[in-house]
UniProtKB/Swiss-Prot annotation:
It comes from Acidiphilium cryptum (strain JF-5). One of its GO terms (cellular component) is plasma membrane. The keyword Membrane applies. Catalyzes the dephosphorylation of undecaprenyl diphosphate (UPP). Confers resistance to bacitracin. It is a multi-pass membrane protein. The gene is uppP. GO terms for biological process: cell wall organization; peptidoglycan biosynthetic process; regulation of cell shape; response to antibiotic. Coiled coil: none annotated. Its EC number is 3.6.1.27. Keywords: Antibiotic resistance, Cell inner membrane, Cell membrane, Cell shape, Cell wall biogenesis/degradation, Hydrolase, Membrane, Peptidoglycan synthesis, Transmembrane, Transmembrane helix. This is Undecaprenyl-diphosphatase. GO terms for molecular function: undecaprenyl-diphosphatase activity.
Length: 282
């Protein structure tokens, strides 16, 4: 993989990881359409992907550092009693929401792994992702009121959102999009749903990197050969992820009616075009 392709791949991953358009779907489809010289079976590819995850998780941690710092302070019992309880409650909700991804991820990783290499399957699921986003908006409109904040989530709500997030184990279904839709169905407004989804993403993305550490050590020699390129890509992915998060939080703050609509239309259009073009690019 050349440095240019590595940077382009990092930009693609860093942006689509947070936008509700499926990073996994894009990193399968786009290289196939553009004939990027990427060998996903290469021993050096896994370390490269792990570094991208590290960059993205770091960006999320930096953007939401105040929230994580407040939760840490609450866990340690520092602050006013009411604030301590609120922060401990938020941390517990995030733990509950993350558990389904951990448990289901281990169970489904091998059975569905063969789907990850198919651009056609990813494109079909990308169209399905657009449908999921539209369904989420319709369900949101049926709920009374304007939506509430994270502090009003119950543990059951958190578990449901975590289960929605697990849809993203299928390539083409967005992790952030599924989690946001889960939040909307439980009554959150768009900004609160996005904030909770992005807070959930930090341990999930970091965990995805940690899980691959044994394989990373196994291919340590190959990793050393492209460490500089992988480090550059991690920085690029982190910067793009940070900017994407800032944009999306501002977007959802200012749009609480059909905010997922443009992303749904994009997914349907790009998925359909990909299904048409991929056979000609093979």
């Amino acid at each position: 993989m050349t440095p240019l392709i590595a940077v382009l791949f990092a930009i693609l991953q860093g942006a689509t990881e947070l936008f509700p358009v499926s990073s996994l779907g894009h990193v399968v489809i786009v290289p196939a359409l553009l004939h990027w010289p990427i060998d996903q079976a290469s021993p050096s590819f896994l370390p490269f992907v792990v570094m991208l995850h590290v960059g993205t998780a770091t960006a999320l941690l930096l953007y939401f550092w105040r929230e994580w710092w407040a939760m840490l302070a609450g866990l340690l019992g520092r602050g006013e009693p009411g604030e301590v309880d609120a922060q401990r409650g938020l941390l517990l909700r995030l733990v509950v929401a993350t558990l389904p991804a951990v448990l289901i991820g281990f169970a489904l990783k091998k059975p569905i792994q063969h789907l990850f290499a198919s651009p056609e399957i990813a494109a079909a699921f990308l169209i399905a992702n657009g449908a999921v986003l539209i369904i989420g908006e319709r369900l949101r409109r049926r709920r009374a009121g304007n939506g509430f904040g994270i502090g009003q989530l119950t543990l059951r709500d958190s578990l449901v959102i975590g289960l929605f997030q697990c849809l993203a184990f299928l390539p083409g279904l967005s992790r952030s999009g599924s989690a946001i839709v889960g939040g909307l169905t439980r009554g959150l407004d768009h900004e609160a749903a996005a904030r909770f989804a992005f807070l959930m993403a930090t341990p999930v993305i970091a965990g995805a990197a940690v899980i691959e550490v044994p394989h990373l050590l196994h291919h340590a020699a190959a990793a050393r050969g492209m460490f500089g390129t992988a480090l550059l890509a991690a920085v690029v992915a982190g910067v793009v992820a940070y900017l994407s998060t800032a944009f999306l939080m501002r977007y959802f703050r200012n749009h609480d009616r059909w905010a997922l609509g443009p992303f749904a239309a994009y997914c349907a259009l790009f998925g359909a075009l990909s299904l048409i073009l991929i056979p000609f690019g093979a």
